[in-house]
């Protein structure tokens, strides 16, 4: 099976990809979306969102990275796909699934699910423009409101000759509600269409991954939010590893401070780590206590100091446990 680290705008940036691919056996990653409007974007935009382009389109640990584009104009999507390919992108992914209101209001992301013909035009333009050896894939939801629309949408992607398709098994209207997941539609898509598929949505552990594979008949899975809830989720899903214990998560939080300070977002670190806690709290009850100690801190150094103190307390408490 394959497990892919999916895109999350504003969350899974190159620093997080670097860290998570060091500790997981991911098959490839997808960047945050590059927003395409009516122009050819300068190189620095691609390098900012995918600095891995300067390393052979791989993370420092060697995991390939696809560049994701989001837009609705076939010509400019194709022009920017060409540019990403020229810069060395491992692959081009096209976002037709983002449910964010601002993106949809500007006719991007999931808004295109209402217009399968436009999806066809965008995918075909990009596939025709990019050299054949570079894969062009797409990411969709089941539809805007009606999951039955997925078949027409998938047909549009397949007819445009995309190399692969990720299906988030909810509609746009379904948001991220667990009750709205509909894996069985991916199985129906698989039976109707020959395009290689990746299943996405509600895979939080090994059992979920196996259930998704069993239901969909697809053995390639993409994880996004869960990869932040449980930092080693890739190995949990792929190899049935135990979830990372809390003390190792704390060590990872300290490693993340080094990534941010060393990287280009040191000034954003206080907000970034608090954002990560919003995910960790779903899997680790201890995260609530630690977040309470950090929430009022606004500078990097006090946060790092508090994390060190907290880690020392954990180690001291563990040392006092009876053998």
Curated annotation (Swiss-Prot):
Class of this enzyme: oxidoreductase
Catalytic activity: 5,6-dihydrouridine(16) in tRNA + NADP(+) = uridine(16) in tRNA + NADPH + H(+); 5,6-dihydrouridine(16) in tRNA + NAD(+) = uridine(16) in tRNA + NADH + H(+)
Cofactor dependence: FMN
MF-aspect GO terms: flavin adenine dinucleotide binding; FMN binding; tRNA binding; tRNA-dihydrouridine16 synthase activity
Residues that bind FMN: 7-9, 68, 139, 200-202, 224-225
EC number of the protein: 1.3.1.-
Site (Interacts with tRNA): 35, 95, 176, 272, 274, 279, 295
UniProt-listed NCBIfam families: PRK10550.1 (NF007838)
Protein task: Catalyzes the synthesis of 5,6-dihydrouridine (D), a modified base found in the D-loop of most tRNAs, via the reduction of the C5-C6 double bond in target uridines. Specifically modifies U16 in tRNAs.
Protein name, per record: tRNA-dihydrouridine(16) synthase
Organism of provenance: Vibrio cholerae serotype O1 (strain ATCC 39315 / El Tor Inaba N16961)
